[in-house]
Swiss-Prot record:
Binds 2 manganese ions per subunit. Belongs to the BPG-independent phosphoglycerate mutase family. SUPFAM superfamilies: 2,3-Bisphosphoglycerate-independent phosphoglycerate mutase, substrate-binding domain, Alkaline phosphatase-like. Transmembrane segments: none annotated. GO terms for molecular function: manganese ion binding; phosphoglycerate mutase activity. The keyword Isomerase applies. PANTHER family: 2,3-BISPHOSPHOGLYCERATE-INDEPENDENT PHOSPHOGLYCERATE MUTASE. CDD domains: iPGM. Substrate binds at residues 123, 154-155, 181, 187, 253-256, 336. Catalyzes the interconversion of 2-phosphoglycerate and 3-phosphoglycerate. This is 2,3-bisphosphoglycerate-independent phosphoglycerate mutase.
């Protein structure tokens, strides 16, 4: 039997729209993608809303996209799960929240809420903060609760933070500190950023600003500093995190929250996030008897109780391949490495048989418009070598550029990012063709195709647009579908029967 190879290349954040103005995908010169779309079967997929397990109209994201891609079924997301708990009131009897409340009362200490304050729905949601505050008011802890607000400006408008701050103040929150997500939610092991936030939260090592909070935020805007990049500052020194306190980390998505959560709960484990085995975490004050609740399970390193356990997904794509004794490779740079591993594997840290992983470090730049190529060239070099070795039966590869550079809001840089990916994609696919394999090309959500909003301001968030799906097999005809249909399609190309747990369907309508 001839060995078959199928490679999946994920063009992160590359959606489709008929709107051509300020559309980086349309404006970029992409001769190879143009060639693929002209010469090979292709279709469009839904990558947002209910089709990926999110509320109707909710934009997709990389975590959700990769979960659905790898699971081969619609994966109902934490956002949907938590929203449902608020509606049916089970949120207010959640055992873990009540344990945190009891801890505060027993120790006569403080309650802290921290997380990303926006309604972007990618990492957190403002409604969850409000529901928690309602619960704390019911338990007479409102006056002893402090909010540590991480401003967004990435999944939302760059200057929307001031409105979220006002909303929360009007709701009754006591905001003790503020910092942009660039510092608080770094996922590229920039521990100097995490250190700044940790020491602000615990040791008063940040400016204490007495101005009205909204005026302070406006001052940042006046200096050209958007929500994402607001530097740490304290508004209420009495609201710092101390021994015996309780913390509820309101982010439900783990990948950007896990480092700060580890620093708070298990600082000795911060080394686990560094490939060289040594972190630069240096918290001034280590906390004792801290009770930490995370909305979902962040990682094995985070010592917390988990408010909402995730549904266990069985027989995902990677497991099917491994159980058949086949070899697979996952490759991405730091920014998207968790997505081709943890998220593609159903939100689990799996050690699959015959599964290799290659992590390419992301460039150490403040924002990726400064290096729109990111690490795509290095990924391409390693991928080509691996494919041509003949060792592997399947490959999962992510090019982060359209999404990560698209998030900066800079059109020219995003165009360059897409052009880089186009040339790299050609090299990867030529290697696949050399081993007589087939390639699937997909995006996990939209972003780079819309670089401005309706008012002409930079649009740095994801979109709800359809995404492309291409199969380099001229003997098939494809039908439209959703991200959950990609894994069944890949199994179909490998002539492997999909497991019954995969409720997605092959997108191959018929053989020509």
């Amino acid at each position: 039997m001839t060995k078959k190879f199928v490679g999946l290349t994920i063009l992160d954040g590359l959606g489709l729209t008929d709107q051509k103005e300020n559309n980086a995908f349309h404006l970029a010169k992409t001769p190879y993608l143009d060639y693929l779309l002209k010469n090979f079967p292709n279709t469009t997929l839904k990558a947002s809303g209910e089709e990926v397990g999110l509320p109707q109209g909710q934009m997709g994201n990389s975590e959700v996209g990769h979960l659905n891609l790898g699971a081969g079924r619609v994966v109902y997301q934490s956002l949907t799960q938590i929203n449902k708990a608020i509606r049916d009131k089970s949120f207010f009897t959640n055992k873990q929240f009540l344990q945190a409340i009891e801890h505060v009362k027993k120790n006569n200490s403080k309650m802290h809420l921290l997380g990303l304050i926006s309604d972007g729905g990618i990492h957190s949601h403002l409604d969850h903060f409000k529901a928690l505050f309602d619960l704390l008011k019911e338990n007479n802890l409102a006056n002893n609760t402090f909010l540590h607000a991480f401003t967004d400006g990435r999944d939302t408008s760059p200057h929307s933070g001031i409105n979220y701050i006002k909303d929360l103040l009007d709701y009754g929150f006591n905001i003790a500190s503020v910092v942009g997500r660039y510092y608080a939610l770094d996922r590229d092991n920039n521990w100097n950023r995490i250190n700044l936030v940790y020491n602000m939260l615990t040791s008063k090592q940040a400016p204490v600003i007495d101005l009205p909070l909204e005026d302070t935020i406006q001052n940042f805007y006046n200096q050209g500093i958007t929500d994402e990049f607001i530097t740490p500052f304290i508004t209420n020194p009495n609201g710092l995190i101390n021994d015996n306190d309780a913390v509820i980390f309101v982010n439900f998505r783990p990948d950007r929250a896990m480092r700060l959560a580890t620093a708070l709960s298990n600082p000795c484990a911060t080394n686990a996030f560094c490939s060289e085995g040594k972190t630069n975490f240096c918290g001034t004050k280590l906390l004792n008897n801290l009770f930490l609740v995370t909305m979902t399970k962040y990682s094995a390193q985070v010592k917390s109780v988990v408010a909402f356990e995730k549904i266990t997904l069985k027989n995902i794509y990677g497991e099917v391949i491994a159980n058949l004794g086949m070899h697979q490779l996952r490759i991405a740079e730091t920014e998207k490495y968790p997505h081709v591993t943890f998220f593609f594997d159903g939100g689990k840290e799996l050690q699959l048989k015959n599964a290799d992983r290659i992590l390419i470090p992301s460039p150490k730049v403040k924002t990726y418009d400064l290096k729109p190529e990111m690490s795509a060239l290095e990924i391409t070099t390693h991928a080509k070598t691996a494919i041509l070795s003949g060792k592997y039966d399947t490959l999962i590869l992510n090019f982060a550029n359209p999404d990560m550079v698209g998030h900066t809001g800079f059109l020219d840089a995003t165009i360059k990012a897409i052009q880089t990916v186009d040339s790299c994609l050609k090299e990867v696919l030529n290697a696949i063709f050399a081993v007589k394999g087939k390639a699937c090309i997909v995006a996990d959500h939209g972003n780079a195709e819309q670089m401005t909003d309706n008012q002409g301001n930079p649009h740095t968030a994801h979109t709800t647009n359809l995404v492309p799906f291409i199969v380099t097999d001229k003997n098939v005809v494809l039908k439209p579908g959703s991200l959950c249909d990609v894994a069944p399609t890949m199994l179909d190309l490998l002539e492997i029967k999909k497991p019954q747990e995969m409720t997605g369907n092959s997108l191959i309508k018929k053989l020509v």
